[in-house]
């Protein structure tokens, strides 16, 4: 299992290289945007985009995993279709070929004969990427490969990726929008139980060199299986344990701290915003991208990511859910939380990843229908939910 996670870290870095390469030239980037077909549109946005970068990343992840772990590819699922129609009306199925030259030739068809762009992309796609992590390298965990399913969101926050804002200032470490909100999400789950087991979140655009204007990224991972919990922030947390501001909000003093912080979507319902302002005061942050908002919880920048609508999907939440599980947290169904009586001692309604929504079509089959709350500390979540319910209008807790 740690071999699979190691490989996922490598392919996520290769994916990040592709995402960065596609942003290097504005002229090239204009070629890479194709509006999504009606059945594939995410209804939250009036206009949604499918990019060649999206599809390339998804195919690179699929085919690299297939090469290293034959059979696993049939359980890799994602948002993107790998079919393109070029300006000449040709329908092309995009795949990773065995050589750089063949991939460049196929990409050239998608890009209407643009050889320079095609060759540049093929070079990045076929580049070997090494990734080492001392914590992971010292671990060996075995799990049957045939119980694993993988959700991939090749480029989450596509709108921010296309817009490409590079000079957005953060608010207490949280970016409201811009390239920093773009993430590559890979979540591994148990296909029998739907429980998330491993997660990788790669943030391709973290800091930009002022001289070269090239971007550097950051990668986060977590593993939670059969009582073993590990994550990439362990070293950061242990270094900070001596101070009052350590990451992680664990321990009794954190559980009873009266102040909460939350990250939300700018499109969040006014009723939720009003209740949150009574619970969190001015510690509410708006940010783009479900993956990025979840990452803010992973990083300990906020206690909670809350979203009341049904426009996030399994590929948006699985990676962060696995990392948060490894940290003692999770992602739960908001609607079920609001309807639950905490006095009955029922388990928190964790999201699961193996079951379609009954009666739904298209991408809605995999929507997180009840909304979600991502958290790092169960005690903090219980206290937060109690306060949220008290501050919501009575009707809102049952909608």
Curated annotation (Swiss-Prot):
CDD domains the UniProt entry points to: IPPase
The protein's Enzyme Commission number: 3.1.3.57
Binding positions for 1D-myo-inositol 1,4-bisphosphate per the UniProt entry: 156-158, 267, 269, 289-290, 293, 311
Entry cofactors: Mg(2+)
Entry comment describing in which tissues the protein is expressed: Ubiquitously expressed, with highest levels in pancreas and kidney.
A GO MF term: inositol-1,4-bisphosphate 1-phosphatase activity
Annotated catalysed reactions: 1D-myo-inositol 1,4-bisphosphate + H2O = 1D-myo-inositol 4-phosphate + phosphate; 1D-myo-inositol 1,3,4-trisphosphate + H2O = 1D-myo-inositol 3,4-bisphosphate + phosphate
Keywords recorded for this protein, A-Z: Hydrolase, Lithium, Magnesium, Metal-binding, Phosphoprotein
Superkingdom of origin: Eukaryota
Activity regulation information from UniProt: Inhibited by Li(+).
Pathway: Signal transduction; phosphatidylinositol signaling pathway
Pfam families for this protein: Inositol_P
GO CC, one annotated term: cytosol
Amino-acid positions noted as binding Mg(2+) 1 in the UniProt annotation, renumbered to this chain: 79, 153, 155
Subunit structure: Monomer.
Purpose: Mg(2+)-dependent phosphatase that catalyzes the hydrolysis of the 1-position phosphate from inositol 1,4-bisphosphate and inositol 1,3,4-trisphosphate and participates in inositol phosphate metabolism.
Matching PANTHER family: 3'(2'),5'-BISPHOSPHATE NUCLEOTIDASE 1, INOSITOL POLYPHOSPHATE 1-PHOSPHATASE
Name used for this protein in its record: Inositol polyphosphate 1-phosphatase
Source species of the chain: Homo sapiens (Human)
Taxon lineage: Eukaryota, Metazoa, Chordata, Craniata, Vertebrata
């Amino acid at each position: 299992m740690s071999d699979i996670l190691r490989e996922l870290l490598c392919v996520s870095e290769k994916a990040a290289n592709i995402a960065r390469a596609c942003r290097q030239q504005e002229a090239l980037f204009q070629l890479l945007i194709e509006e999504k077909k009606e059945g594939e549109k995410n209804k939250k946005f009036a206009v949604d985009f499918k990019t060649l970068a999206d599809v390339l990343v998804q195919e690179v992840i699929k085919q690299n995993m297939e090469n290293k772990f034959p059979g696993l590819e049939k359980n890799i699922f994602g948002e993107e279709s790998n079919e393109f129609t070029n300006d000449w009306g040709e329908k092309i199925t995009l795949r990773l070929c065995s050589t750089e030259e063949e991939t460049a030739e196929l990409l050239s068809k998608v890009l209407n004969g643009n050889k320079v762009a095609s060759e540049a992309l093929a070079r990045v796609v076929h580049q070997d990427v090494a990734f080492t992590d001392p914590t992971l390298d010292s671990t060996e965990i075995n799990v049957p490969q045939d119980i694993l399913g993988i959700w991939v969101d090749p480029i989450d926050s596509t709108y921010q990726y296309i817009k490409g804002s590079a000079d957005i200032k953060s608010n207490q470490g949280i970016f409201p929008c811009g390239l920093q909100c773009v993430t590559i999400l890979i979540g591994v789950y148990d296909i029998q139980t739907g429980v998330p087991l491993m997660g990788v979140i790669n943030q391709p655009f973290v800091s930009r060199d002022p001289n070269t204007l090239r971007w550097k990224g950051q990668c986060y991972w977590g593993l939670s299986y059969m009582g073993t919990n590990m994550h990439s922030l362990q070293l950061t947390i242990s270094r900070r344990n001596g101070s009052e501001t350590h990451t992680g909000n664990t321990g009794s003093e954190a559980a009873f701290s009266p102040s909460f912080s939350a990250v939300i979507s700018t499109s969040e319902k006014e009723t939720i915003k009003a209740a949150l302002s009574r619970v969190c005061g001015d510690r509410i942050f708006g940010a783009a991208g479900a993956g990025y908002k979840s990452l803010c919880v992973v990083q300990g920048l906020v206690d909670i990511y809350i979203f009341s609508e049904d426009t996030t999907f399994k590929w948006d939440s699985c990676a962060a859910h696995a990392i948060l599980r490894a940290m003692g947290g999770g992602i739960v169904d908001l609607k079920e939380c609001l309807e639950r009586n905490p006095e009955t001692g029922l388990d928190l309604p964790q999201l699961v990843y193996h079951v379609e929504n009954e009666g739904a079509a298209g991408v809605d089959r995999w929507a997180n229908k009840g909304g979600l709350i991502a958290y790092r500390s169960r005690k903090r979540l219980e206290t937060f939910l109690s306060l949220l319910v008290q501050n919501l209008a009575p009707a809102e807790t049952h909608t």
